[in-house]
Regions:
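Glycine-rich phosphate/ribose-binding loops and adjacent secondary-structure elements
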Residues: 198-357
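Ordered alpha/beta subdomains of enzyme catalytic regions
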Residues: 1-219, 246, 323-448
Length: 448
């Protein structure tokens, strides 16, 4: 399926009309999240890397024009103005891994209007999904308080490619590994895994299964101990570890039941057998809330595997993300509707100490000591720097997380920082609003 035709129909009809009307001036669009979902104190910017790949390859080919014509049930000649359209614009963006807040642009596109319009849907689809999942995974990292996390989400994500990206996003915020082989290969993430209950069930006994697995995979192994009776499974695993002289690097996995109580009993059995170095790994419907509860109760769990709820960002599976025109042909524009008003002009986010962020105009000088977050990552349709890596994004995330106020880091009832608006952006917003209301009477209509 062509990435060009992976779009909403109205992007095509608008772009065609722009071309017919010779509206090819440069347009600036801003992509941002209006409000944070409940239970979120921050977001993690993600999706920029695949977005830049998409833009660098974007070109409307003959087959795309034919598909558009067939969809609209119009002669292919009517859609001919779209043929050959490619992206040669500029992109400024917040790098992946940076923590961002509501109302702050994650990405701004400046390009001829038809181009900038046609890429809207694909960009929103990428950044909305990936920022939501990265933000969920980041909260798991907070909850784990330094304990390793492994991504187990592939089988429950919204499609195979979503699972590959979920693994990348988990690595981006500090997960130690993934069960996803494709993601491990593509992004250089450590692969990790144990066994399924089916493996144990296929053998005549649990012990036979454990011994066979250890024979097949010399070295450290992790044994799933809850297929039948967890306490007996732990005892069997301990016996196998002792008999085969396994220990350092090995582990047992608990996947059901009262994980805290089971872990405490398992630790007692393992330590009593002289297996203090055998790790306990917990899984089974966990996300930041479950991990936080287990950590707070002091459960002797060494690592956590999280899947379904993280790979789908289950409690906040979407973001109120928008991509809005803020300038056309040098003229700042804005939307006035009361619930979804926008601010005009290309913007920059200036980060001061303690996440005292200010959203201002792109050409403003930063306030003293503040760091501009958006940087130019594409010019003339070409990347300005080499592709980013999950490791580099992880370093940025860890720096931002360390500086994030404690109330925003809370798992329960977090309080996000609220960015300020610069005086110059406030003044421009007032001016543009007045011009629109004078021209259209919108203010009088709303007031009346």
């Amino acid at each position: 399926m062509s990435q060009v035709t992976t779009t909403d129909l109205y992007e095509v009809t608008m772009a065609l009309s722009y071309l017919r009307e010779d509206m090819r001036g440069r347009a600036a669009f801003s992509l941002f999240v209006r409000d944070l979902p409940p239970g979120r104190g921050f977001l993690v910017a993600a999706g920029l890397e695949p977005a830049l790949d998409y833009l660098s390859r974007f070109r409307v080919g003959r087959s795309d024009v034919q598909d558009f014509a067939d969809t609209l049930r119009r002669p292919v000649g009517d859609l001919e103005p779209l043929h050959g359209l490619s992206f040669d614009g500029e992109v400024r963006a917040v790098p992946e891994g940076r923590i961002v807040l509501a109302g702050e642009p994650l990405l701004e596109v400046t390009a001829p209007l038809p181009q900038a319009q046609l890429v809207e849907t694909y960009l929103l689809s990428l950044l909305c999904h990936q920022t939501a999942v990265a933000s969920k995974a980041a909260r798991c990292v907070l909850a784990a308080a330094g304990r390793p996390l492994v991504d187990f989400s592939l089988r429950r994500t919204h499609g195979p490619e979503a699972g590959v990206q979920a693994a990348r996003l988990c690595a981006l915020v500090g997960f130690a590994g993934t069960s996803n082989v494709a993601a491990a290969r593509r992004y250089g993430i450590a692969a990790a895994g144990t066994m399924a209950h089916a493996y144990v069930e296929a053998f005549g006994s649990e012990e036979e299964a454990f011994r066979a697995f250890a024979r097949t995979h010399p070295g450290p192994v992790a044994l799933l101990v809850d297929t039948y009776d967890t306490d007996r499974g732990v005892a069997t695993a301990a016996r196998v570890f002792k008999d085969l002289r396994l220990g350092p690097g090995c582990g047992i996995r608990l996947d059901s039941g009262d994980l805290g109580a089971l872990a405490r009993r398992a630790r007692t059995v393992l330590d009593g057998a002289g297996l203090e170095e055998v790790r306990i790994i917990a899984s089974g419907g966990l996300d930041e809330y479950g991990v936080d509860r287990l950590v707070r109760e002091g459960a002797p769990i060494d690592a956590y595997a999280v899947g379904t709820k993280v790979g789908t960002a289950a409690d906040a599976p979407y973001l109120d993300m928008a991509y809005k025109l803020v300038e056309y042909d040098g003229r700042p524009v804005m939307k006035l509707s009361s619930a979804k008003a926008t601010a005009p002009g290309p913007k920059q986010v200036f980060r001061g100490p303690g996440f005292r962020d200010v959203v201002g105009l792109a050409h403003e000088d930063p306030p003293g000591g503040a760091e501009p977050l958006l940087r130019t990552v594409m010019r003339g349709g070409l990347r300005t720097e080499p592709p980013d890596t999950p490791a580099a994004a992880r370093e940025r995330f860890e720096r931002d997380l360390a500086a994030l106020p404690e109330e925003a880091r809370r798992i329960e009832r977090p309080v996000p920082p609220v960015p300020a608006v610069s005086p110059r952006l406030t003044a421009l917003t007032t001016l543009v609003r007045h011009r629109i209301e004078t021209r259209t009477g919108a203010g009088r209509t709303a007031a009346g």
